[in-house]
Amino acid sequence: MKVAVLGAAGGIGQALALLLKTQLPAGSKLSLYDIAPVTPGVAVDLSHIPTAVEVKGFAGEDPTPALEGADVVLISAGVARKPGMDRSDLFNINAGIVRNLVEKCAAACPKALIGIITNPVNTTVAIAAEVLKAAGVYDKNRLFGVTTLDVIRSETFIAEAKGLNVDDVKINVIGGHSGVTILPLLSQVQGVSFSDEEVAALTTRIQNAGTEVVEAKAGGGSATLSMGQAACRFGLSLVRGLQGEENVIECAYVDGGSEHADFFAQPILLGKNGVESVLAYGEVSEFEANARDAMLDTLKADIKLGVEFVK
């Protein structure tokens, strides 16, 4: 199994690469690419960790050598948020980066599963889809927006608020991956109930958690370590699905035939072809139904921005 990380010298990329080096199945290959000249050195550094995962690093303008033969590609390249920015402010820089990298994926590894981490995910996934369509290799079951950070934050914050073991908390987070488009389905969490006030406060905290980190780092970065963990969890789930493991389920932002929008985050069953099936996200509360309906104009506008960027 070969996993490529594009943007591997960045804050998310290095954290993700470290976690993959220690957690990928024995015999896997880990390929690191970044435009930054330090990238081969990151690979050398990681290669000293005693796990049966082979690491190679590639720098420069062309990621093709890193992509050849990749089964999974995780794209975290781009600029990070700074105080005062929201994820959509990143669009002007990151849109072009994602377009260029996905063009290379289309040529070098057209069958790979591609996970987009680069923000704004609501838009960059739509860009990736249009690039793959233009190249004639688009398969909606092989493209994912990685929204796992919203899930792990929800798990953490719920466990903290209710004094639970975080391993026991399971939650679906639907919609998109910025602001009001992030919707944790708190009404579905087993064995716990929330007051209306708790639901409103927790939902807002989960939606604004990225900003919480950006402000806490005081201009020194955004959520890199927790995002690295989230991306590793999702990447490992992709690998487990490819290897034939059953019942591998994650939430992700996909072109899944949703009634709500062309791309929508919801639970998916992963397998040898990427998305084996898109799962129903179940019954929602009145609060959740209203929040879902209220987000759709924002989500659709984000998607349209990505489609028009490529066209």
Curated annotation (Swiss-Prot):
Substrate binds at R81, R87, N119, R153. It is an enzyme of class 1 (oxidoreductase). InterPro entries: L-lactate/malate_DH (IPR001557), Lactate/malate_DH_C (IPR022383), Lactate/malate_DH_N (IPR001236), Lactate_DH/Glyco_Ohase_4_C (IPR015955), Malate_DH_AS (IPR001252), Malate_DH_type1 (IPR010097), Malate_DH_type1_bac (IPR023958), NAD(P)-bd_dom_sf (IPR036291). One of its GO terms (biological process) is malate metabolic process. It catalyses: (S)-malate + NAD(+) = oxaloacetate + NADH + H(+). Keywords: NAD, Oxidoreductase, Tricarboxylic acid cycle. Gene3D superfamilies: Lactate dehydrogenase/glycoside hydrolase, family 4, C-terminal (3.90.110.10), NAD(P)-binding Rossmann-like Domain (3.40.50.720). Homodimer. NCBIfam families: MDH_euk_gproteo. Catalyzes the reversible oxidation of malate to oxaloacetate. Belongs to the LDH/MDH superfamily. MDH type 1 family. This is Malate dehydrogenase. It comes from Shewanella sediminis (strain HAW-EB3). The gene is mdh.
